[in-house]
Regions:
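Rossmann-like adenosine-cofactor binding region
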Residues: 176-272
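C-terminal helix-to-coil terminal segments
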Residues: 89, 97-109, 265-324
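Hydrophobic Val/Ile/Leu positions in short beta-strands of Rossmann-like dinucleotide-binding domains
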Residues: 9, 146-148
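N-terminal Rossmann-fold NAD(P) dinucleotide-binding loop
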Residues: 155-156
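Phosphate-binding beta-alpha-beta segment of Rossmann-like dinucleotide-binding domains, i.e.
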Residues: 93, 99-145, 306-307, 311-319
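Phosphate/diphosphate ligand-binding glycine-rich loop within oxidoreductases
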Residues: 49-125
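N-terminal glycine-/charge-rich "phosphate-binding" loop or analogous flexible N-terminal tail
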Residues: 1-52
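Glycine-rich Rossmann-fold phosphate-binding loop(s) that bind the pyrophosphate
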Residues: 151-152
């Protein structure tokens, strides 16, 4: 191969998406820089040592040891738990993530879930399967209360897309003093949370998984929800107590659930959630759209421009570390 590039894209794709479109998107946005794709492990080993910017799903310790010139690693995932973060930090490498790039697609999927419950589209499909032309009554979203737990990029995108449906929105976040786009906003304090849940028609979980949010929705919270309420989880499976959710669904304690994430995940083929008619299940595909690479390329291109303009690492977009 020729001289090392300015930006190296590692070979592993994500969510069924090949990396070639990512390379093309970066080249369009960085016309003055050499962007190369490492198609093989040998390419990665050959090009990494003198490349200042590497981007991809992950970087293993063996390759990192060889990446002497590495200044910035742009992770193609929102989560970075799989990265050798200590080794990256020790080498002074700036790490950014893909946080926010999935928000539009996930928010659209949330609306799809909610409207499926509102308009009883599952019942329509069942009658179609039976070739049964018999009317049934559905409802309207207008006048409903939608509660969103987590007001980051995904939660904010959900609220934005609910505008025009004439609904009341309640937001809950770890730092309610920051405010938010919802009509009301609370923290995760138990009393405040239950007050919100008692008035909720559709509960959307869009918060990160932390020690605070793990098991946040359990038996008590599900009992507070009205029986007509539906739960939508596009966050992380363990935010909901699965056994408690199963009990609520089986007893009609809540109307239904739409789950893009589960606990456990992947969901075993013999898990009872598969058999419940009042459950919508998708295999963690809420953010799986062709816009993944263009949005990620936008972030990386903006960050490289900022660095060229003299910005510090902490001024970059989606920076994971250094944090201060």
């Amino acid at each position: 191969m020729s001289l090392s590039p300015d930006v190296l894209v590692l070979r592993e794709g994500t969510e069924g998406l090949a990396t070639e479109p990512y390379v093309e998107a970066l080249r369009e946005r960085l016309p003055d820089q050499e962007v190369r794709l490492a198609r093989t492990p040998e390419d990665e080993r050959e090009l990494a040592p003198e490349t200042p910017v590497i981007t991809g799903v992950g970087i293993d310790t063996d390759l990192l040891v060889e990446a002497d010139a590495l200044r910035l690693f742009a992770c193609a995932f929102a989560g970075t738990e799989h990265l050798p973060t200590e080794a990256l930090a020790d080498r002074g490498v700036i790490v950014t993530n893909a946080g926010g790039i999935h928000a539009p697609g996930i928010a659209e999927q949330v609306l799809g879930y909610i409207l499926t419950f509102v308009r009883r589209l599952q019942e329509g499909q069942r009658r179609k399967d039976r070739r049964e032309w018999r009317h049934f009554q559905s409802a309207e979203l207008t006048g409903s209360t939608v509660t969103i737990l987590g007001l980051g990029s995904i939660g904010g995108a959900v609220v934005k897309r609910l505008q025009g449906f004439e609904v009341e929105t309640i937001g809950a976040r770890y730092t309610p003093e920051k405010g938010g786009p919802t009509d009301e906003i609370y923290g995760f304090d138990s009393t405040e949370l239950h007050d919100a849940l008692a008035r909720t028609d559709y509960l959307v979980l869009a918060c990160p998984l932390t020690e605070t949010t793990r098991g946040l929705i359990g038996t008590a919270e599900l009992r507070t929800l009205p029986p007509s309420a539906a739960l939508v989880n596009v966050a992380r499976g363990p935010i909901v107590d699965t056994d408690a959710l199963l009990a609520a669904l089986r007893s009609e304690g809540i109307r239904g659930a739409a789950l893009d994430v589960t606990d456990p995940e992947p969901l075993p083929t013999d898990h009872p959630l598969w058999n419940l008619d009042n459950v919508l299940l998708t295999p963690h595909t809420g953010g799986h759209t062709p816009m993944h690479w263009p949005r990620l390329a936008d972030i990386l291109a903006r960050n490289l421009t900022r660095l060229d303009d003299g910005a510090s690492a902490t001024e970059l977009e989606n920076v994971v570390f250094p944090s201060e």
